[in-house]
Amino acid sequence: MPKRDIKAFLYDILEYMDDIINFTKNMEYEEFINNKAIKYAVVRCLEVIGEAVKKIPKDIREKYPHIPFKELAGMRDKLIHQYFGVDYLTVWETAKYEIPEIKKEFEKIIKDIEGKDENSL
């Protein structure tokens, strides 16, 4: 399998963040907690985001220290390894309140990287 470049991982992160935002749009916690399909979908998206974040090189993570890379990766680890103890309130709060803001930061990273690509032509 060919090696993926950083932009591919960043676009994966954005795609799964968009999915989370769309899955939980116009939804309250009570509806979320009672909808097994949405809960599982959001958890899976967070797992993929966390895995993709681990592929972001150290120099980029250091350039954007305000982005919670470590926390996103850590959440993935907790979700993967604590399947009987998932804290759905934390999942909900992350999905509803944190992901939309963090997504903006990842969009900035992509814009910065794509700007560098254009300047190097």
UniProtKB/Swiss-Prot annotation:
Keywords: Hydrolase, Nuclease, Nucleotide-binding, Phosphoprotein, Toxin-antitoxin system. It holds the Pfam family HepT-like. One of its GO terms (molecular function) is RNA nuclease activity. It comes from the Archaea. InterPro entries: HepT-like, HepT_RNase_toxin. Modified by antitoxin MJ1215 or MJ1217; probably at least 2 successive AMPylation events occur on Tyr-83. The modification O-di-AMP-tyrosine is found at Y83. The active site is at R76, H81. One of its GO terms (cellular component) is toxin-antitoxin complex. A motif (RX(4)HXY motif) lies at residues 76-83. Homodimer, probably forms a complex with antitoxin MJ1215 or MJ1217. PANTHER family: RNASE MJ1380-RELATED (PTHR34139:SF1), UPF0331 PROTEIN MJ0127 (PTHR34139). Probable toxic component of a putative type VII toxin-antitoxin (TA) system, probably an RNase. Probably neutralized by antitoxin MJ1215 or MJ1217. Neutralization may be due to AMPylation by antitoxin. This is Putative RNase MJ1216.
